[in-house]
């Protein structure tokens, strides 16, 4: 007689629910801890406001106010620094725009100058610099000074010859003489002979120092000694020595002589 033995291969028993779905045995109904929803872990050192005493709560609120005040101060400082940086950037941009505008105007003026030079036939300098470089070139200055007076550069007006008249005349004027000729005329307003005048040069030669005192006109004289008609001192009638007459022929410059006319001898 065969006996029915329950199978031991599977120890799992299936229980059907009223809806017909199989339900595992209580052995498999045990869930793992990871399957359960995790609860937020509390940080150490934190306490709930509800558990604080009134003094602790007041101190906590004071600390919070101080922290918020510091945060607001830092935020305000940061905003002011950003505003200053923005203003600096704007000013730099304005300076750059002004510089660009000046550069554009400078280029326009250079083009206008070049056009005017071309219109009036003025030679354009080799560089675009508004000033001629030859002004600051030492070699150009030395070469210009070493050149003759007849050659002139086109940058300068020609100057008339030295000694020419400054007034513009229809006929060319003669150049000035460097030395004036000495005049041989004894006196411009005299009609008498040469012996009637006392010729006294300002630079007396050494041979005339020994002349007698009678040949010289005295500085002090009375009214009777003067000629009433002309106001000249009367002649004393003393003949001049031959040495003085010989010295009279020396060439003396015209500007260094002094003439003292005398009245004719009575």
UniProtKB/Swiss-Prot annotation:
Q: Where is the composition biased (Polar residues)?
A: 7-22, 47-56
Disulfide bond annotation, renumbered to this chain: none
GO CC field: nucleus
The signal peptide, as residue positions, is none
Q: Where in the cell is it found?
A: Nucleus
Q: Which residues form a coiled coil?
A: none
Annotated spans, Basic motif: 59-81
Region (Disordered) residue spans: 1-73
Q: What effect does gene inactivation have here? A: Impairs pathogenicity on barley and rice plants, as well as on detached barley leaves. Does not affect the differentiation, turgor build-up and maturation of appressoria but impairs the formation of invasive infection hyphae and completely abolishes the ability to penetrate into barley and rice epidermal cells. Has no effect on conidiation, mycelial growth nor resistance to cell wall and oxidative stress.
Domain of life where this protein originates: Eukaryota
Q: Provide the primary localization.
A: nucleus
Keyword set, alphabetical order: DNA-binding, Nucleus, Transcription, Transcription regulation, Virulence
Region of interest called Leucine-zipper, as start-end residue ranges on this chain:
82-89
Compositionally biased region (Basic and acidic residues): 61-73
| Transcription in keyword set | yes
What GO annotations for molecular function exist for this entry? DNA binding
Q: Which intervals hold domain bZIP?
A: 54-95
Organs and tissues of expression: Expressed in appressoria.
Q: What does this protein do?
A: Transcription factor that is required for infection of plants hosts. Is not implicated in the development of appressoria or the subsequent penetration of host leaves, but is necessary for the initial establishment of the fungus within plant cells by orchestrating the expression of a unique set of early invasion-related genes within appressoria, encoding secreted effectors, enzymes, secondary metabolism-related enzymes, and signaling membrane receptors. Controls the expression of targeted genes by interacting directly with a 5'-TGACTC-3' motif present in their promoters.
Give the family, as the similarity comment puts it: Belongs to the bZIP family.
The name of this protein is Transcription factor BIP1
| Gene source species | Pyricularia oryzae (strain 70-15 / ATCC MYA-4617 / FGSC 8958)
């Amino acid at each position: 007689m065969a006996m029915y033995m329950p199978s031991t291969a599977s120890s799992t028993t299936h229980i059907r629910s009223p809806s017909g779905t199989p339900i595992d045995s209580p052995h498999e109904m045990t869930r793992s801890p990871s399957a359960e929803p995790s609860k937020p872990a509390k940080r150490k050192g934190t306490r709930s406001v509800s558990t604080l005493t009134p003094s602790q709560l007041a101190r906590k609120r004071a600390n919070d106010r101080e922290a918020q005040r510091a945060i607001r101060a830092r935020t305000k400082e940061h905003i002011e620094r950003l505003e200053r940086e923005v203003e600096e950037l704007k000013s730099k941009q304005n300076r750059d725009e002004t510089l660009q505008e000046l550069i554009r105007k400078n280029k326009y003026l250079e083009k206008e100058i070049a056009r005017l030079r071309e219109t009036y036939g003025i030679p354009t300098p080799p560089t675009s610099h508004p000033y001629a470089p030859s002004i600051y070139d030492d070699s150009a200055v030395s070469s210009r000074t070493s050149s003759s007076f007849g050659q002139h550069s086109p940058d300068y007006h020609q100057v008339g010859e030295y000694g020419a008249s400054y007034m513009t005349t229809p006929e060319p004027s003669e150049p000035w003489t460097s030395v004036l000729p000495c005049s041989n005329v004894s006196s411009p307003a005299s009609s008498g002979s040469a012996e009637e005048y006392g010729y006294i040069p300002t630079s007396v030669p050494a041979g005339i120092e020994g002349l007698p005192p009678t040949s010289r006109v005295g500085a002090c004289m009375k009214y009777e000694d003067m000629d009433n008609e002309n106001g000249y001192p009367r002649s004393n009638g003393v003949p001049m020595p031959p040495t003085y007459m010989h010295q009279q022929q020396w060439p003396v410059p015209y500007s260094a002589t002094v003439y003292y006319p005398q009245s004719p001898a009575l």
